[in-house]
Amino acid sequence: MTMELTPRERCERAVRFEDVDFVPLTIYERKIPQCEAERELRNDGLCIVQRGPGVFGVRRPNVLGSESHSFVDNGRRVTRTVTRTTAGELSTLVQPAGFTTWHHEKMFKGPDDYAALLAYASDVEVVPNYEPFMRMDELKGGDAVMRGAVGLEPMQLIVHHWMGVEVFAIEWMERRDEVLKLYEALVEERRKTYPVLAASPCEQFNYGGNVTPEIIGEARFREYYVPNYEECCEVLQPAGKLVGCHFDANTRVIADAIAETSLDYIEAFTPAPDTDMTLAEARAAWPDKALWINYPSSVWLRSDEAMEEVAVDLLKQAAPGNGLLIGVTEDVPDGRLYPGLNAINRAIHEHGRLPIA
């Protein structure tokens, strides 16, 4: 196959199962510094995944104000944010930690916070904000593929952002009705978001992710996650948009449920040895969904030769290669980024031209 594609065009075609010259290699915009080695990789096909700026804003009429202040506590630099709602105050305490953030206190601390959280999530207004996205899109040109975000799934936001797993488990058993009130309010907020996304200049959107099946389980996934994916797809897909989800954990338990969704692509799927499904199993389970995988994080600790061998094996597992993109969605050990990317790229250029035998 002879064609001249920019990195962006290659990704945009591959995720739609259209013909490409070779399997795309991508990396998040925050995972790679701009430098000579990065430029050489881009010249050789590496595509940057530009996640933002977003295409919408949110106005919360029940929020009266929010204040943040930073201080040192036991040698730690932390930030407390206090949000005042019409039904009470909510607060968080976070600690910046290099490339991540430690959440020492989440918004929900006990049953007394339900009223304030419900006020926070209710009567939300979603407003378009397309200009920043359009400017970034023009700046990036053919070097980056632009990706938008719907936001976390309503239940995922409650579990991981507002409560934390342990607290959620207790609340789910003790005060499920209160949890479901929050869930319904967030579902309504998402429903207001979908038309704004459909009318936006962005062509693809991730809807949440980081689902942990061992915690959520198949039944709750089907009841509280899948319907939201479907509602989103019903609005966005007729407008020509693609909808995917960041499934980077063990997905075997929910593989059948994922297969039944209308999602266009599975993003950050991390094959064995890091999770409980191989790439071949994922392709068999989800034949109609593009697989925008994360190159297994543990393999970055191996030699360049071993990384190249694993990349070749992944390409063969996904033969003939349509609808496959290899991405880097996690942090890479110090000193391994550029050697590893070059190893993967060599495998792609030597063994990843379509159709893969």
Predicted regions and their residues:
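Segments that shape or occlude catalytic/ligand-binding pockets
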Residues: 30-67, 71-72
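Short, surface-exposed loop and linker segments with low hydrophobicity and enrichment for Pro/Ser/Thr
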Residues: 10-21, 64-80
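Active-site loop segments of alpha/beta catalytic cores
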Residues: 1-32, 116-357
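Polar low-complexity intrinsically disordered regions enriched in Ser/Thr and small residues
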Residues: 48, 57-60, 68, 113, ...
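A contiguous, low-structure linker/loop signature
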Residues: 69-123, 142-145
